[in-house]
């Protein structure tokens, strides 16, 4: 079918046709376009708008196209888009009666519907992958409830924690990413079909029926908004950008922890590379590429917002340029989930090195201050000053945390406050021991092994409820 034959006197210039065609990325909505056309055709027949026998022919042709696949379409740029390519296929199969398929429908509401149908499935796929990843992280955390390591602030030793506790931080952030996607899905799952070009149609169509046929939760209440809204795309790509950031943070820590200086983990060979000149090298290339690809996903979001920012209502062809950025973001993040999951679940943990670092640089100092407060009723700020001075003196004296005892603490307290603390030596030793330090933090959300197990149990319950 020549769409231009009525209003225009010539075909589009070849380069202009290629420049404006969306066919290079319309394969993402091929299945959705068939589904949309089928639902609309069934509705037209149900409402008596087109003959039932014509509708049957159209649906048979669409079924044949679904079986043959997108390769059956003429994808020449002059066709413009997937909608016309599909219509041309049906026309070639059944003749001019194929034109009934477009009754009361515009490419404006059709593409908006296709995008929502296709994106709905992509979000569900990503969500399933994300739940699986969170589940796997939770399992890994259970294996490391007593793998003591140092936690960092400002990338400086801060306080002892466990790898299990740290892994559940990953799981918690990814759970929020999952929840954001579920919330966005509510706004994606709205039916624009029936809005036509922008003001619906004079044909007595049934929007409730197409909404049911396409499995949408509801239809959109304003036809102008329905054909021009792409905020659901921007919202989705923001969610994906945030998810990519969290995956990038995991990747960054794997890069750091696998260095000789940290030496906490070894990344699997399957997710590493080597150097073309330095034979000793084992490089965390997968983690580095994941980190870099996060920026490309963020770039897709910025581009989408830039395209949308000044468009008058309703439809503008500019909106066509939004969709490739959506699909690139979707494909990139889905790939990131899979490779980061494989990398993280395959790490080999050096428990001895992790424990060594936890006890090497006074990461237990906070608990020593807490014990002073509890045992002697001293304000925390005074205890903070005592322990801060103790750390400075110990470093100057070349002492490790394990070398500090209650006598040494009394010397420092005398210097700072003019009086000794005279704490039980066992209390001081316990406060400075990384494992004991962790075990004392039996607060919900904390690193004590039993608290991590509770966190895992709660996460598992959440995952189970979401999978139902």
UniProtKB/Swiss-Prot annotation:
Name this polypeptide is given: Argininosuccinate lyase
A GO-annotated cellular component: cytosol
A Pfam family assignment: ASL_C2
Keyword set, alphabetical order: Amino-acid biosynthesis, Arginine biosynthesis, Cytoplasm, Lyase
Catalytic activity of the protein: 2-(N(omega)-L-arginino)succinate = fumarate + L-arginine
HAMAP family found in the cross-reference section: Arg_succ_lyase (MF_00006)
Keyword Lyase: yes
Family as reported in the entry's similarity comment: Belongs to the lyase 1 family. Argininosuccinate lyase subfamily.
Enzyme class: lyase
Keyword Lyase annotated: yes
GO MF entry, a single one: argininosuccinate lyase activity
BP terms from Gene Ontology: arginine biosynthetic process via ornithine; L-arginine biosynthetic process
Entry's EC annotation: 4.3.2.1
Subcellular localization, as worded in the UniProt entry: Cytoplasm
Gene3D superfamilies reported for this sequence: Fumarase/aspartase (C-terminal domain), Fumarase/aspartase (Central domain), Fumarase/aspartase (N-terminal domain)
Pathway note: Amino-acid biosynthesis; L-arginine biosynthesis; L-arginine from L-ornithine and carbamoyl phosphate: step 3/3
């Amino acid at each position: 079918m020549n769409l231009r034959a009525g209003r225009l006197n010539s075909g589009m210039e070849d380069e202009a046709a290629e420049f404006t065609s969306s066919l290079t990325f319309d394969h993402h909505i091929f299945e959705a376009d068939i589904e949309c056309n089928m639902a609309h055709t069934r509705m037209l027949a149900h409402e008596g708008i087109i003959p039932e026998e014509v509708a049957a022919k159209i649906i048979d042709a669409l079924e044949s196209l679904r079986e043959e696949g997108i390769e059956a379409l003429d994808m020449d740029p002059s066709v413009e888009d997937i909608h016309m390519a599909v219509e041309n296929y049906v026309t070639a199969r059944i003749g001019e009666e194929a034109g009934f398929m477009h009754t009361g429908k515009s490419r404006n509401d059709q593409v908006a519907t296709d995008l929502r149908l296709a994106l709905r499935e992509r979000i569900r796929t990503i969500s399933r992958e994300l739940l699986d990843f969170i589940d796997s992280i939770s399992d890994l955390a259970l294996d490391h409830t007593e793998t003591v390591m140092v936690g960092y602030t400002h990338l400086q030793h801060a306080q002892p924690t466990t790898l299990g506790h740290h892994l559940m931080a990953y799981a918690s952030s990814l759970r929020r990413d999952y929840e954001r996607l579920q919330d966005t899905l509510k706004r994606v799952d709205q039916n624009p079909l029936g809005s036509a070009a922008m003001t619906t149609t004079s044909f007595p169509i049934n929007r409730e029926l197409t909404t049911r046929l396409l499995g949408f939760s509801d239809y959109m209440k304003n036809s102008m908004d329905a054909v021009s809204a792409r905020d659901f795309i921007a919202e989705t790509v923001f969610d994906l950008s945030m998810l990519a950031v969290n995956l990038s943070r995991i990747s960054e820590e794997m890069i750091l922890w696998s260095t000789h200086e940290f030496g906490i983990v070894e990344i699997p060979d399957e997710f590493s590379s080597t150097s073309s000149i330095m034979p000793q090298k084992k490089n965390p290339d997968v983690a580095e590429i994941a980190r870099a690809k996060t920026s490309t996903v963020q770039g897709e979001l910025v581009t989408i917002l830039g395209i949308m920012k000044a468009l008058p209502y309703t439809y503008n062809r500019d909106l066509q340029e939004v969709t490739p950025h959506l699909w690139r973001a979707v494909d990139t993040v889905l790939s990131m989930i899979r490779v980061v999951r494989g990398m993280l679940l395959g790490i080999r943990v050096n428990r001895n090195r992790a424990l060594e670092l936890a006890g090497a640089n006074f990461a237990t100092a906070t608990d020593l201050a807490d014990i002073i407060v509890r045992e002697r009723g001293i304000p925390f700020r005074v205890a903070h000053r005592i322990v801060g001075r103790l750390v400075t003196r110990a470093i100057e004296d070349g002492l490790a945390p394990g070398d500090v005892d209650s006598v040494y603490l009394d010397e420092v307290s005398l210097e700072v406050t003019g009086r000794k603390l005279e704490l039980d030596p066992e209390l001081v030793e316990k406060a400075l021991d990384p494992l004991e330090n962790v075990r004392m933090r039996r607060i919900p959300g904390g690193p004590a092994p039993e608290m991590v197990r509770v966190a895992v149990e709660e996460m598992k319950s959440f995952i189970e409820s979401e999978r139902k």
